[in-house]
Amino acid sequence: MQSWYLLYCKRGQLQRAQEHLERQAVNCLAPMITLEKIVRGKRTAVSEPLFPNYLFVEFDPEVIHTTTINATRGVSHFVRFGASPAIVPSAVIHQLSVYKPKDIVDPATPYPGDKVIITEGAFEGFQAIFTEPDGEARSMLLLNLINKEIKHSVKNTEFRKL
């Protein structure tokens, strides 16, 4: 009887494991989310697994043995409770497949009003307030210098959120 199971994949090999399992006629589910991150100094939307290194698979252990699944490239092991692989309820799989996250952001990405610290340049060590992005690779920060607030454009790689 077909059931859903949870696999733990080797680091960075989730996609490889999914491809090889799908070639063996195994249904796979790896829920993804889209995050807005600063990558190489530019603000971009990045698609990442909701559960890094975990892959939900549906198969019949009497047709495809668990050792075959376990020996697939990229797979580390089954998530188990005791000696046997844990069965994931179909209701959980259904909820994961229809789940559409809203406005998920990387906690390290600053937004207007967030406090940041400048890590490089002439104002290194100064605290500032993030006001707005200034193109793809820079941002406008509000610095308080001698009781006067000054807007200053800084590279996205030269500050971090507090």
UniProtKB/Swiss-Prot annotation:
Disulfide bridges in this chain: none
A Pfam family per the record: NusG
Key word Ribonucleoprotein present: no
Disruption phenotype: Inactivation results in increased initial adhesion and biofilm formation.
Molecular-function GO terms, alphabetical: bacterial-type RNA polymerase core enzyme binding; DNA binding; regulatory RNA binding; transcription antitermination factor activity, DNA binding; translation activator activity
Coiled-coil portions: none
Cited SUPFAM superfamilies: N-utilization substance G protein NusG, N-terminal domain
Keyword field: DNA-binding, Transcription, Transcription antitermination, Transcription regulation
Cellular component, GO, one term: cytosol
Domain of life according to the entry: Bacteria
Family, per entry: Belongs to the RfaH family.
Subunit structure: Interacts with both the nontemplate DNA and the RNA polymerase (RNAP). Monomer in solution.
NCBIfam families linked: PRK09014.1 (NF006534), RfaH (TIGR01955)
Name of the protein this chain belongs to: Transcription antitermination protein RfaH
UniProt source species: Escherichia coli (strain K12)
Highest classification ranks of the organism: Bacteria, Pseudomonadati, Pseudomonadota, Gammaproteobacteria, Enterobacterales
